[in-house]
Amino acid sequence: MATITPQKGSQSEVGVSNTDPLNWGNAVESLKGSHLEEVKGMVAEYREAVIHVGGGETLTVSKVAAVANQYLQAKVDLSESAREGVDSSCKWIVDNIDKGIPIYGVTTGFGANSNRQTQEGLALQKEMVRFLNCAIFGYQTELSHTLPKSATRAAMLVRVNTLLQGYSGIRFEILEAITKLLNHNVTPILPLRGTITASGDLIPLSYIAALLIGRRNSKAVGPSGESLNAKEAFHLAGVDGGFFELKPKEGLALVNGTAVGSGVASMVLFEANILALLAEVLSAVFAEVMQGKPEFTDHLIHKLKYHPGQIEAAAIMEHILDGSSYVKNAKLQQPDPLQKPRKDRYALVTSPQWLGPQIEIIRFSTKSIEREINSVNDNPLIDVTRNKAVSGGNFQGTPIGVSMDNARLAVASIGKLIFAQFTELANDLYNNGLPSNLSVGRNPSLDYGFKASEVAMAAYCSELQYLANPVTSHVQSTEQHNQDVNSLGLISALKTVEAIEILKLMSSTYLVALCQAIDLRHLEEIFKNTVKNTVSRVALKTLTTEDKEETNPFRFSEEELLKVVDREYVFSYIDDPLNVRYPLMPKLKQVLYEQAHTSVINDKNVSLLVFEKIGAFEDELKSLLPKEVESARVAYENGNPATPNRIKECRSYPLYKFVREELGIRLLTGEKALSPDEEFEKVYTAMCQAKIIDPILECLEDWNGVPIPI
C-alpha cells in the first residue's frame, strides 16, 4: 500500500498512515474515552490564548470556535516550518506553466467551461474573483444577508489551515495577510447565502479574495464594527506592500474549498457538545426537584443496552443523584405510594436512553468535521513529490452537510426532551406537589409564574422540530449540470446555527425554571415544618384533658394529624391554609371527628363535650397558623429561613449557585415588577459567552468517569 507523505513543511499528523490506510482505525480511536473528558479537553483548547496552525498542529472545533468567538478572539500563530512546503507548490505552478503543461483552473476555464484555454493566468484569477462576486447583501434594507462576523473568522482560519499544507499553489505571504486580518480583528464581509458547498464555498470565499486584491466592492468590518474598504482594512491590519496580484492558481486556492461550511460547523459543534452535557445535568436536576426515583440510572439497566452514550448519560445522572440531599431525604421519608405513580414518566425515567444517541451523533459529527477542517479540499492538488497536479472532488462538502443534518436532528431531540421536562415541571397535575406554573406568590390568583414561558417554550420547540428536517435532500443540479450533486454544507450548517440558538433559548428558560423549582422545594419544606409544628402546639393546647377520670379520645390524635399534613401537598393549601375548600382543614377535622365519634360510641367515660374541643382546635389553628406561615415566608424572603436549602448539599449546586449568585437571578413572582424575560436574558447571554461551562463541569468535577458499581 502506498504511503501518502505530507510535503516538506506541511502538516504531518493529520494524514493517513501505512498501518491504517483506510483511516477507520484513526476514526475509531478518536472516539475513545468519555464524552465528558472530551468536552473538558475542548474547553481547555477553547481557552488557549494563541492557536498554532501548521507544522503538524491539528485544528479542532474548539480552536476554531476560540478564534471565531467575539468575546475571546484568540490569536493565530502560523508555523514558519510550513513556509517551504507552501512556497514549493506555488513555485511548481509557475515552473509548469512555463513548460506549457495544461493545469485545470490555471490554464483552463472552470467547471463546465474547463474546455476553454488561456495563457493569461493572472487575468484568469482576477476574472474568477470578479464573476464569483455575485451575492446580494441587502445593505440598504432592514434584513441583512451578511454572514456573521464569527463565521467569517472561522472560515478564514480553516482556509489558512488547508492552504498551509502545501498542496494548493499559493504564496505563504497571502496566508500571513489573512492571519494579520484575523489577529487585528479586521473581518471581510461575506454573503450569508449563495453557496452549495460543492465546488467548495466559491461565492463567499471569493469575497476574501476580493479584499486581498483590493476590489472596489469589497468591504470589511473593524474591531468596533466600523465599515472599512480594502485599503483601510489593510492599513488597520498592518498588511504592508499593497494589494496582492494573484498568481496563477492563487485565486482558485482561496475560493475552491469547504472552509465556510466547515468553519460554521465547527462553531456549531463546540456549542452542541456543551449543550448536550448541560442537558444531562439538567435532567438530573429535574429528577431531584420532581422527587423522582433514582433507580432509573442504575448501571445494570444501561449496561444491558450497550450504547455508550446512554451508559455515560446515565452514569453522569447517577453521580449527581447519588450525592443529592433530595434523594437521601426521600429515602428517609418514603412517600405515600397512593400519592404518585409507581413509575416516573418517560421524560425523566428514559432521559439517558433519549440523550445517549444524541451524544453519540454529536461526537461522531464533531470528529467528521475535525477531519474536514484538517483536510486539503481544493482542486487541483499539487503533488510536488510526484511532479503532477491531481484533479478530484475534495471540494465536495458532503461530510459537512451530512454531519450538520445529523447534529441538527440531535439538537432538536435534546430540545424536545427539555420541553417535555419543562411542561411536566410547570403542571401541578404531574410535578409532585409544586404549585401550578411554579408560582411562588402569596396569592396564586395574582401570580402566573411560568405560564407564558411554557407557551414560549412550545413555540421554540415547534420551530426546532421544523429545523430538524434535512437540508441535504434538497439538492439542485447547477452550473450547466456540472455540479449535479452538491452537499449544501453551509446551508445545513447555518440551519444548525439556528437550531443551537433555539436550544439555548430553551435551556436558558428551563434552567431558571429548575432553580425556581429548587427554591419552591425549599419553601415546601419550610412550610411543612411550620404547619406540623403549629398543628402539634395547637393539639397539645386544645385537645388534652385535665380530668383523670375522663378518657381522652384525642390522646393519639397528634400522630394522625401530622400524617394528614405529610400526605397533603403544601402548595395545595398554603395561600389560605384554613380555607374549607382546600384539603388541609377538612381532613384535620375529619381525623378528630372520627376519633371523637368512635370514642363516644365505645367508651361511656367519654362525654359529648369532646366535640367542643374540635371547635377549640379549629379556632386556635385559625388564629395561629396564618401568622406562623407568614412569619416563615418573611424570614425566607429576608434570607433567614428556618431550614437551610438542601441544594447546597447537592452536586448540582454549582449550577444553582451560578444562576442565583453570579447572575443574580431571583425568584420570579407576581409580587415583584421583574418580568421573566429580564432573568432569562441573563442566562442566555451567559451561555453565548460560554460562562455556563464552568458551573456544568463543577457539578461533575469529582466524578471518576465510571458508573457506580452494581
Curated annotation (Swiss-Prot):
Q: In which pathway does it act?
A: Phenylpropanoid metabolism; trans-cinnamate biosynthesis; trans-cinnamate from L-phenylalanine: step 1/1
What NCBIfam families does this protein map onto?
phe_am_lyase (TIGR01226)
Task: Indicate the cross-link positions, 5-imidazolinone (Ala-Gly).
Answer: A198-G200
Which EC class heads this enzyme's classification?
lyase
The EC number(s) attached to this protein equal 4.3.1.24
This protein's major location comes to cytoplasm
One Pfam family here: Lyase_aromatic
Which positions are catalytic residues?
Y104 (proton donor/acceptor)
Q: Which Gene3D superfamilies match?
A: Fumarase/aspartase (Central domain), Fumarase/aspartase (N-terminal domain), Phenylalanine ammonia-lyase 1, domain 3
Which reaction(s) does the protein catalyse, per the Swiss-Prot or TrEMBL entry? L-phenylalanine = (E)-cinnamate + NH4(+)
Q: What SUPFAM superfamilies does the database record attribute to this sequence?
A: L-aspartase-like (SSF48557)
Q: How is it modified after translation?
A: Contains an active site 4-methylidene-imidazol-5-one (MIO), which is formed autocatalytically by cyclization and dehydration of residues Ala-Ser-Gly.
Residues modified as 2,3-didehydroalanine (Ser) are S199
Keyword Lyase recorded: yes
- Region Disordered, residue ranges: 1-21
What does this protein do, in the record's words? This is a key enzyme of plant metabolism catalyzing the first reaction in the biosynthesis from L-phenylalanine of a wide variety of natural products based on the phenylpropane skeleton.
Q: What is this protein called?
A: Phenylalanine ammonia-lyase class 3
Q: Which residues bind (E)-cinnamate?
A: N256, N379, K451, E479, N482
A GO term, aspect molecular function: phenylalanine ammonia-lyase activity
Q: Which UniProt keywords apply?
A: Cytoplasm, Lyase, Phenylalanine catabolism, Phenylpropanoid metabolism
Please name the InterPro entries in this protein's record.
Answer: Aromatic_Lyase (IPR001106), Fumarase/histidase_N (IPR024083), L-Aspartase-like (IPR008948), Phe/His_NH3-lyase_AS (IPR022313), Phe_NH3-lyase (IPR005922), Phe_NH3-lyase_shielding_dom_sf (IPR023144)
Any one biological process term the GO annotation gives: cinnamic acid biosynthetic process
Q: Describe its assembly.
A: Homotetramer.
What family classification does the UniProt entry report for this protein?
Answer: Belongs to the PAL/histidase family.
